[in-house]
Amino acid sequence: MDEKIRIKDIAERAGVSVGTVDRVLHKRPNVSQKAREKVEKALAEMDYQPNMYASALAYNKAYTFYLLMPKHESEAYWEEIEEGAMKACELMRDFQINVKIMYYKRFDTPSFIKKYTECLDSAPDGVIIVPAELETTRQFTDKLHQHNIPFVLLDSNMPDLRPLSFYGQDSFSSGSFAAKVLMLVASNEQEIMLMKQMKDGKVVSKQQENREVGFRHYMHDHFPHIKITELNLPLEYERKNYDEILEDFFTSHPQLHHCITLNSKAHIVGSFLLHTNRRDVQIMGYDMVGKNVECLKQGSISFLIAQHAYMQGYSCVDTLFRAIVLKKEVEPVNYMPIELLLKENVDFYRRTQL
């Protein structure tokens, strides 16, 4: 019905008092089963939809959501997530939504545990988590479940943890897409390089692991003859060490022209290629990080895949708001668009598009 339905109208249809309707709508006690059924029948017949926004405003309760994410230094992907989250907070200020950001040191389990302990001690209404390793994150989410605190996962999907919702790319599809795009320019090659950044011999991001599965699956099915040579640039190394490793690699692989990384650090290789004047080699990577964009425009990076980080940050806060404040159902899995950036279109990328 287009007309506004009043409590008085519902009471007349159900043949009960206005007070009875009010108690049913707000799930209060002291209503007989017969009266409740009459009211519920009237609500269904009149297609009544409660004004959840008005109810939330009238409730006049403040809510605090925590965003637990890696500490970073001017890294565009994480900055955009923060900006999106804080924009959502700003737009919901009438509902007294407060978002607090807590930073943990990347790839540092004790740091993650310390921060999630502080988060739990603060008794938040909801939490947004950029996951660490699976079992470490599980320790946190198990405690959230124990305290009935809803949480949303951002960036990496771990469905076994039973989150309220997830926002990020479909990592397998993203990796497969990356392989398909790379082969548009490298299908005649005999060998390509896959650059990784590892710690203690393993990739620390579940998202990157899943991207690699998708990448290799596509390559195996469509270009099995192309050799994939891995190059590790250890996370704990400094830039000068990377340059030494890269110089040795490209000197010993003079016929290799195309590389890819499934993380946001394509600029490490891209910058090296520029300052060593290797104009016949390119790398493909992820994320519209400032240094990546510079290399993309100068030609050492061939393509970038964007993840709509701003949208992720905004949507995570909005999902907690809708689930906790408005008591609405939310989508459990929300995959971000897989967007391809070239030097010709990178300046038109709308990072804040919602």
Residue spans for each PLM region:
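Hydrophobic alpha-helical segments within soluble ligand-binding/sensing domains
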Residues: 166-193, 242, 308-325
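Hinge/beta->alpha junction and helix N-cap segments in small-molecule ligand-binding domains
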Residues: 70-79, 100-111, 168-174, 196-214, ...
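Flexible loop/hinge segments that line or gate small-molecule binding clefts
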Residues: 136-173, 289-297
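N-terminal helix-turn-helix DNA-binding module of bacterial transcription factors
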Residues: 1-60
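Hydrophobic alpha-helical
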Residues: 127-145, 229-291
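Short helix-capping segments at alpha-helix termini
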Residues: 91-95, 147, 219-227, 274-280
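Amphipathic helical "hinge" segments at domain boundaries
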Residues: 51-110
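Hinge/cleft segment of the Venus flytrap/periplasmic-binding protein
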Residues: 42, 46, 202-203, 219, ...
